[in-house]
C-alpha cells in the first residue's frame, strides 16, 4: 500500500512539473493584419513605417498593439497599464523587407531582442525609435548605417522611452528599464 501511494505521488509530481513547464511558455505572437489599431495612437499600424509591437496580457482577449517598439516598451513602464503581461513581441527589423514594410509575422520576444537607440530613423509616429533585432550583426550594420547604439531590453533608458521622444532626454546616465537606480 505504501509503495502504491509513493508511486502515485511520484506520478503526480512528474505530471505537475510538465504542467508548470507548459504554463511557463509564453503564448505565441499574433500575425499583424489590416485590422490592428495602435493602443496609444488609435491608428492602423500598417499605415506607419518602422517596427511594431504587441503585448499579450493575461486579462485581455486580444493582444495590445503598438505603432512603434518604443511605445511597446513604454507600456511596460507605465504604472496604470496592466501588469499581467504574458509576452512582449516586437518586429525583428533584421528580417524586415524595409523600414516602410517591417513585416507582419517576423516577431521576436522583446526581452531577448537587441535595440538600436538614437538612430536617425524615426518610428511610426515620427518619434525616436528603439529598433529591435534578433541578431547582433544586423543591429551593428543598422547602427553603422543610421547611427545609434545597441542596448538590451533592460538597458533601454526610461527617459528615452518616456521622454519627449525627440532624443533630447536620452541620457546615458539615466536609470535603465528593469533596474533600480
Task: Cite the ranges covered by each PLM segment.
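Beta-strand-rich cores of mature extracytoplasmic or soluble domains
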Residues: 100-153
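C-terminal partner/receptor-binding element of secreted or periplasmic proteins
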Residues: 134-181
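Cys/His-coordinated zinc-binding microdomains
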Residues: 42
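Short functional micro-motifs and their immediate structural scaffolds
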Residues: 23, 46
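Bacterial signal peptide processing site
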Residues: 18-21
Amino acid at each position: 500500500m505504501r509503495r502504491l501511494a509513493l508511486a502515485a505521488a511520484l506520478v503526480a509530481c512528474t505530471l505537475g512539473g510538465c504542467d508548470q513547464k507548459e504554463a511557463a511558455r509564453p503564448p505565441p505572437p499574433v500575425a499583424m493584419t489590416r485590422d490592428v489599431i495602435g493602443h496609444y495612437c488609435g491608428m492602423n499600424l500598417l499605415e506607419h513605417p518602422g517596427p511594431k509591437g504587441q503585448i499579450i496580457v493575461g486579462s485581455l482577449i486580444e493582444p495590445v498593439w503598438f505603432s512603434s517598439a518604443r511605445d511597446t516598451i513604454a507600456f511596460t513602464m507605465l504604472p496604470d497599464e496592466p501588469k499581467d503581461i504574458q509576452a512582449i513581441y516586437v518586429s525583428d527589423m533584421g528580417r524586415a523587407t524595409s523600414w516602410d514594410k517591417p513585416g507582419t509575422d517576423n516577431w521576436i520576444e522583446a526581452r531577448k531582442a537587441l535595440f538600436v537607440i538614437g538612430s536617425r530613423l524615426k518610428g511610426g509616429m515620427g518619434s525616436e525609435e528603439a529598433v529591435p533585432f534578433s541578431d547582433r550583426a544586423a543591429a551593428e550594420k543598422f547602427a553603422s548605417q543610421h547611427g545609434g547604439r545597441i542596448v538590451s531590453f533592460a538597458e533601454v533608458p526610461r527617459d528615452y522611452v518616456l521622454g519627449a521622444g525627440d532624443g533630447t532626454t536620452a541620457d546615458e546616465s539615466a536609470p535603465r528599464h528593469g533596474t533600480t537606480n
